[in-house]
Amino acid sequence: ESVILWQSFDFPTNTLLPQQLLSRNTKLVSSRSQTNHSSGFYELFFDNNNVLSLLFNGPEVSSIYWPEPWRVSWEARRSTYNNSRIAVLNSLGNFSSSDDFTFLSNDYGAVLHRRLTLDYDGNIRLYSWEKERQTWVVSWQANQRPCRINGVCGANSLCKYVVGSGRKCSCLPGYKMKYGPDWSYGCEPEFDLPHNKHESVFLL
């Protein structure tokens, strides 16, 4: 008799496939960037209140940003009473979670190749394979306002959404981008901060 000792479906990375369970013992972790596929700063998991949540787990701060933390669970249409902590996507485009969160894809009902991915920018998106164009298209996403995603532009920065071109990050006056094309590192001062413990500086 054959016994399964290990299977990849039990250990998702940043993506769930149809019928693959997300449970209390698993989570999705975003990649670092579009080209760097090491673990990033965003996680999708069930929190201690049994709610499916998105977490920004940055180098200096950690915070849940979805559902909106200022809402109580019933305002966000979530239930905390079911502690089974299971979520699953089916091949028709229906996602269902034990906290009562559910959604249907824009193309619900069609049998397509699908994947639910926690992207590097902290947004969850459902992708459907469009056979004619031979490409993945977004058929649902959790956050329509990318600037509400925690840490998306890093520290000391501003986030602005431009219709047609998407999210734009910029540094605060007196700051510069810290690391190349990766905005998640944020911005650093263009001026030198004093290292002498007897000196002080006052910033407006």
Which role does the model predict for each range below?
Residues 1-204:
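Beta-rich ligand-binding surfaces for carbohydrates and other polyanions
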